[in-house]
């Protein structure tokens, strides 16, 4: 089959790889019909994630049609249309039973964190979904079955696998409530979805921060938010604190280590002393009010010097963070899409054949052609 493979830093290649096979009784194989490129995939190609091997199949936002099921799969059959979450989870351990399936104890033998598709040996080493076919472990739990009556196109549903649901979880986990002022750092797909959900939760004011003008304008046009370009201000954190009269109730960091790096951070990252940048988190620590909440959703890797712990602790700021446990949220996300309460279609800017994955990665990474979200079609 054809698949998108990692071949080194900033080098992805579509090539032939072996077809996946049923390995355990609760596995299934899906024929992938759509698969998206995620912002966290960029961390892989930038070299920020360890244990990446050449020819590893990447991608973790797939959906498709069930092709084959193992003997232990009872909840699905051949021909079912499914969305596959980025979490791989057993459904039976303590964490899965307590709605923290992103930390499943049974799916990743390689570390403390949970398992994810296509995200290196660190997260289980499972081949990813940017391919013609995908093996799905723990298939009875690791899926959302789309009702047969659904006529929504893939482009509106594939984002439920990660970006849309992670955006909702960010807002939910941060405790955004009616009347809150919320700052969302980042106008990539997760940040854009988080902005939508802030309004759904009753926020009275939502401010989006980025430095890419077309993304800021997209946020303003589609999400009706205030926008701030951080390059227009010498100290963006203090500026945000000033315009919110003491800071926001909640600041959501939807950027992570992929923000703009200083020369020193660039050097440290190249030497593997530092994973990207902490610039978004520093802004968050300055822009949040006393007793407010910082929600860290953007991915960070490793340990960091310069973490503003004293500023956070002295002002009674709460920190919430983690990888979104998307599986138990997926039915609600589907309901929001199918009833028209949320339209994820405006986040998907490009639909390309799988064969053009390299181009998709290039425009997404370089922020060219007004790219916001790329969906690949095998």
From Swiss-Prot:
EC number: 1.-.-.-
Gene3D superfamilies in the record: Medium-chain alcohol dehydrogenases, catalytic domain (3.90.180.10), NAD(P)-binding Rossmann-like Domain (3.40.50.720)
Cofactor(s) for this UniProt protein: Zn(2+)
Residues noted as binding Zn(2+) 2 in the record, renumbered to the chain: 90, 93, 96, 104
Phenotypic consequence of gene deletion: No aldehyde-stress related phenotype.
Keyword list, A-Z: Metal-binding, Oxidoreductase, Zinc
The keyword Glycoprotein appears for this protein: no
Leader sequence segment: none
GO molecular function: oxidoreductase activity; zinc ion binding
Keyword Nucleotide-binding: no
Record CDD domains: FDH_like_1
Family, similarity comment: Belongs to the zinc-containing alcohol dehydrogenase family. Class-III subfamily.
Official protein name in the record: Uncharacterized zinc-type alcohol dehydrogenase-like protein AdhB
Source organism per UniProt: Bacillus subtilis (strain 168)
């Amino acid at each position: 089959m054809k698949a998108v493979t990692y071949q080194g830093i900033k080098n992805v290649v579509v090539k032939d790889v072996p077809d996946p096979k049923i390995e355990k009784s609760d596995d299934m194989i899906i024929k992938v019909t759509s698969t998206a490129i995620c912002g966290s995939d960029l961390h892989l190609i930038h070299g920020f994630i360890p244990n990446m091997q050449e020819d590893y199949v990447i991608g973790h936002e797939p959906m498709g049609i069930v092709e084959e099921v193992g003997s232990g799969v009872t909840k699905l059959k051949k021909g079912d249309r499914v969305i596959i979450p980025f979490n791989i989870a057993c459904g039976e351990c303590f964490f899965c039973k307590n709605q923290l399936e992103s930390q499943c104890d049974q799916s990743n033998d390689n570390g403390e964190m949970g398992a994810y598709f296509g995200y290196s040996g660190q997260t289980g080493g499972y081949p990813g979904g940017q391919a013609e076919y995908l093996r799905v472990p723990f298939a009875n739990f690791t899926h959302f079955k789309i009702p047969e009556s659904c006529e929504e196109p893939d482009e509106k549903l594939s984002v439920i696998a990660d970006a849309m649901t992670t955006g909702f979880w960010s807002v939910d986990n941060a405790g955004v409530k009616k009347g809150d002022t919320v700052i969302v750092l980042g106008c990539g797909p997760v940040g854009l979805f988080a902005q939508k959900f802030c309004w759904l939760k009753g926020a009275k004011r939502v401010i989006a921060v980025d430095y890419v003008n077309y993304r800021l304008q997209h946020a303003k046009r589609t999400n009706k938010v205030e926008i701030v370009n951080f390059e227009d201000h010498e100290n963006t954190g203090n500026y945000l604190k000033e315009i919110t009269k003491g800071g926001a109730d909640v600041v959501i960091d939807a950027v992570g280590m992929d923000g703009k790096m200083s020369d020193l951070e660039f050097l440290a990252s190249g030497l593997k002393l530092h994973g990207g940048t902490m610039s978004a988190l520093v802004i968050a620590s300055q822009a949040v009010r006393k007793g407010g909440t910082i929600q860290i959703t953007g991915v960070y890797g490793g340990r960091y010097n310069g973490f503003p712990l004293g500023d956070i602790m002295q002002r009674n700021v709460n920190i919430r963070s983690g990888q979104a446990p998307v599986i138990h949220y997926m039915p609600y996300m589907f309901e929001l899409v199918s009833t028209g309460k949320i339209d994820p279609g405006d986040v998907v800017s490009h639909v390309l054949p799988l064969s053009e994955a390299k181009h998709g990665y290039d425009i997404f990474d370089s922020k060219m052609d007004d790219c916001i979200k790329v969906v690949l079609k095998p």
